[in-house]
Amino acid sequence: MEAVVDTNNFVLLLWSGAQLPKDIEAVVGSLTKKVGPNGKVSLEHSDRLHIASHAMSSFDVVLSGVCESPSLIHSMELLSKLAKLLKPDGKLILREPVGSNDSRSPEKIISTLKLSGFVSISQANEVKPSIVEISAQKPSFEVGAKTALSLSFAPKPAQPKAETSAAQIWTLSAQDIDDEDVDLLDSDTLLDEDDLKKPDPLSLKAACGPGSGKKKACKNCTCGLAEQENGDATEKKSVTSSCGSCYLGDAFRCSTCPYLGMPAFKPGEKIALTDRQLKGDL
């Protein structure tokens, strides 16, 4: 176990369960001797790790469950916490009991380590029956580290021109135009006189009967159907009086009357209102 620890290393020893004090003291003593006076060995229980005041990226090596009779189950939450405590390129050595079923197998532990951000994961030889030892390493970068991308904003070189033979296929020379053997279409002959006639709006209406519907104007309508639809919409906006006294003048009009402010007019006389007058005041 001391082989993974170097001089001047900061080591975190994580334990859990009912460990014997002499077993913990033996491991701490051997590690303290290995790291030397400039190193440090910190002892922490797994249940109190979340309230400990350890700084992030402060340990070179984390030894978890390496004492006698390990019982610590390394969840993803615990492994993610250990990854934050390790320095970049820091090492993690863990031991965990495994059962005969697939609920806690070495493959499951390795998968959890990968999801927690560890790399260079390897399984050591069997320490004891039903106990597995796995080593892993934190990547060489910190969590949330930033790096500059080598982006070039220099002008890009011009694209190579198309082959001359390919360009000549789509071009005509002056000699080709004067050549009598070349048939050129006259654009004035593409449309007949019937094509230039404006259609009758009545012919655009759909036939009556079951399943027949009204034709709608196209987006770029040029046949006059759009103007006809707009005219129908304008006629639908005709305003009717609910009191029948609007034509007498403002003295007989409501506060929201669209004719308010206009002079009196004859009953049945057509009065044109603007869009602003058709909208009531809020």
Swiss-Prot record:
* Region ranges (Fe-S binding site B): 243-257
Gene Ontology process terms (BP): iron-sulfur cluster assembly
GO terms for cellular component: cytoplasm; mitochondrial intermembrane space
Where would I look for the motif Cx2C motif 1 in this sequence? 243-246
Bilayer-spanning residue ranges: none
Names of the cofactor(s): [2Fe-2S] cluster; [4Fe-4S] cluster
Binding of [4Fe-4S] cluster occurs at C243, C246, C254, C257
Annotated region (Fe-S binding site A) at 208-223
From the UniProt entry, list the residue stretches annotated as the region N-terminal SAM-like domain: 5-151
Q: Which Pfam families does UniProt cross-reference here?
A: Anamorsin_N (PF20922), CIAPIN1 (PF05093)
UniProt region (Linker), positions on chain: 152-196
Motif Cx2C motif 2 covers 254-257
What's the stated role of this polypeptide? Answer: Component of the cytosolic iron-sulfur (Fe-S) protein assembly (CIA) machinery. Required for the maturation of extramitochondrial Fe-S proteins. Part of an electron transfer chain functioning in an early step of cytosolic Fe-S biogenesis, facilitating the de novo assembly of a [4Fe-4S] cluster on the cytosolic Fe-S scaffold complex. Electrons are transferred from NADPH via a FAD- and FMN-containing diflavin oxidoreductase.
Q: What is this protein called?
A: Anamorsin homolog
